[in-house]
Regions:
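Catalytic core of pol beta-like nucleotidyltransferases
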Residues: 1-54, 60-68, 77-121
Length: 121
């Protein structure tokens, strides 16, 4: 058995780990998007005063890195934010919900411009 370090073998191993990581992240991103859509439907069904649900952040923005431990970011307009918090608690993902009317104006405009409308009435 040789004690020599095989640089090519190390590079191949690192490449395989990297590809596996990115494959896992891509699958998890898609699963998070589907979960966000389902949560938006449930939010709108459960609260007739809710007007719009947006998804934003790394789950929805391809230009942002997504990690397997990334969370789902949702913004709502109208509705009961506390009821929304309770509803998303059961998700397998960590979910952050913000009331867009309570956000700083620039942040709210960014969500409206770049976010994905997941549901609206």
């Amino acid at each position: 058995m040789s004690d020599e370090f095989d640089i090519q073998q190390a590079a191949d191993t690192l490449k395989n780990w990297t590809w596996a990581y990115y494959r896992e992240a891509a699958l998890k991103r898609e699963k998070a998007r589907e979960e966000a859509k389902m949560l938006a439907r449930r939010l709108l069904e459960s609260d007739p005063t809710l007007k719009t649900v947006w998804g934003f952040g790394s789950v929805f923005e391809e230009s942002r890195p997504f990690r397997p431990d990334s969370d789902i970011d949702l913004a709502i307009e109208g509705g009961d934010i506390f009821a929304a918090f309770r509803l998303v608690e059961g998700s397998e993902f960590k979910v952050d919900v913000v009331d867009i009317t309570d956000c700083h104006d620039e942040f709210a405009e960014r969500i409206r411009a770049q976010g994905v409308v997941l549901g609206q009435r």
